[in-house]
Amino acid sequence: MTTASNTPLPSGLRKPLDQFYEYLRAEKGLSLHTQRNYKQQLETMAEHLHSMGLKAWPQVDAGWVRQLAGKGMREGMKASSIATRLSSLRSFFDFLILRGILTANPAKGVSAPRKKRPLPKNLDVDEVNQLLEVNEDDPLAIRDRAIMELMYGAGLRLAELVDIDVRDVHLRSGEIRVIGKGNKERKVPFAGMAVEWVGKWLKVRSGLADPSEPALFVSKLGTRISHRSVQKRMAEWGQKQAVASHITPHKLRHSFATHILESSNNLRAVQELLGHENISTTQIYTHLDFQHLADVYDQAHPRARKKSSQHKEEDE
């Protein structure tokens, strides 16, 4: 944003600012550092409003506030810096409401731009194949490969995977019932190597699981496996299989999404498969049924195409 100019602010802008600074000092008891931060933010915004022809704070509406935020974005300000300025402005407007200068806070409905979170690097298909070439007969190794095949084969969140019960898995139809964010239930297709290795795990699971334990994946103690255990075992397998990238559950989920999208170019289906919340809005305009999702999955997923030749498992 522009720096303060030498042109004095009109009294309609200047006087309320000075009153607010005194309020911060005398009544709020804020530190000098915090007071300076408020003043720096507000002076810059006041100068910009003045340059746009405003002479008093009651002239400011949500549109002007959005212009301030937009100007910051265009000038390359960080999202966190814009959020700080909007926060200062909201506090100032609340003060003006207390003083009867404003009747409503025009910055209340204006959101700062979201901070861009860098996506985790995904594995390429060769790295995934290298990771998943686990052919040990130990029940825990079979379990771990089933977990990784399912995580990559269905794009599940870690919490979704850990919460799966045996009754949620249907091998013959290639469906898993999962509970996603917001306690929302969805059916997820899985196939090929994921079906094969979950089936292998189910054959040896009874040797580890307590008879009353409903969880699909259990620890060596026979109870539902923990999030931390899954993370730890995946990282260990990444090292054991000499995969260069650090292996995490979310990296497998992200790789699933990337590889499906690269193969199908069907962003809408990928969003459905991942269970993203914003799908509920787009479903008003277009609805993809489960069979369509399963078809996209079967055609696009690199390991779904590796069908086991004579897989005849019953539903578990």
Curated annotation (Swiss-Prot):
<dbReference type="InterPro" id="IPR004107">
    <property type="entry name" value="Integrase_SAM-like_N"/>
</dbReference>
<comment type="similarity">
    <text>Belongs to the 'phage' integrase family. XerC subfamily.</text>
</comment>
<dbReference type="Pfam" id="PF02899">
    <property type="entry name" value="Phage_int_SAM_1"/>
</dbReference>
<dbReference type="GO" id="GO:0005737">
    <property type="term" value="C:cytoplasm"/>
</dbReference>
<feature type="active site">
    <location>
        <position position="250"/>
    </location>
</feature>
<keyword id="KW-0238">DNA-binding</keyword>
<keyword id="KW-0131">Cell cycle</keyword>
<feature type="domain" description="Tyr recombinase">
    <location>
        <begin position="118"/>
        <end position="298"/>
    </location>
</feature>
<keyword id="KW-0132">Cell division</keyword>
<dbReference type="Pfam" id="PF00589">
    <property type="entry name" value="Phage_integrase"/>
</dbReference>
<feature type="active site">
    <location>
        <position position="157"/>
    </location>
</feature>
<feature type="domain" description="Core-binding (CB)">
    <location>
        <begin position="11"/>
        <end position="97"/>
    </location>
</feature>
<dbReference type="InterPro" id="IPR010998">
    <property type="entry name" value="Integrase_recombinase_N"/>
</dbReference>
<keyword id="KW-0159">Chromosome partition</keyword>
<dbReference type="InterPro" id="IPR044068">
    <property type="entry name" value="CB"/>
</dbReference>
<protein>
    <recommendedName>
        <fullName>Tyrosine recombinase XerC</fullName>
    </recommendedName>
</protein>
<feature type="active site">
    <location>
        <position position="181"/>
    </location>
</feature>
<keyword id="KW-0229">DNA integration</keyword>
<feature type="active site" description="O-(3'-phospho-DNA)-tyrosine intermediate">
    <location>
        <position position="285"/>
    </location>
</feature>
<dbReference type="InterPro" id="IPR013762">
    <property type="entry name" value="Integrase-like_cat_sf"/>
</dbReference>
<dbReference type="GO" id="GO:0009037">
    <property type="term" value="F:tyrosine-based site-specific recombinase activity"/>
</dbReference>
<dbReference type="InterPro" id="IPR011931">
    <property type="entry name" value="Recomb_XerC"/>
</dbReference>
<dbReference type="GO" id="GO:0007059">
    <property type="term" value="P:chromosome segregation"/>
</dbReference>
<dbReference type="GO" id="GO:0003677">
    <property type="term" value="F:DNA binding"/>
</dbReference>
<dbReference type="GO" id="GO:0006313">
    <property type="term" value="P:DNA transposition"/>
</dbReference>
<comment type="subunit">
    <text>Forms a cyclic heterotetrameric complex composed of two molecules of XerC and two molecules of XerD.</text>
</comment>
<feature type="active site">
    <location>
        <position position="253"/>
    </location>
</feature>
<feature type="active site">
    <location>
        <position position="276"/>
    </location>
</feature>
<comment type="function">
    <text>Site-specific tyrosine recombinase, which acts by catalyzing the cutting and rejoining of the recombining DNA molecules. The XerC-XerD complex is essential to convert dimers of the bacterial chromosome into monomers to permit their segregation at cell division. It also contributes to the segregational stability of plasmids.</text>
</comment>
<dbReference type="InterPro" id="IPR011010">
    <property type="entry name" value="DNA_brk_join_enz"/>
</dbReference>
<dbReference type="InterPro" id="IPR023009">
    <property type="entry name" value="Tyrosine_recombinase_XerC/XerD"/>
</dbReference>
<keyword id="KW-0963">Cytoplasm</keyword>
<dbReference type="InterPro" id="IPR050090">
    <property type="entry name" value="Tyrosine_recombinase_XerCD"/>
</dbReference>
<keyword id="KW-0233">DNA recombination</keyword>
<dbReference type="InterPro" id="IPR002104">
    <property type="entry name" value="Integrase_catalytic"/>
</dbReference>
<dbReference type="GO" id="GO:0051301">
    <property type="term" value="P:cell division"/>
</dbReference>
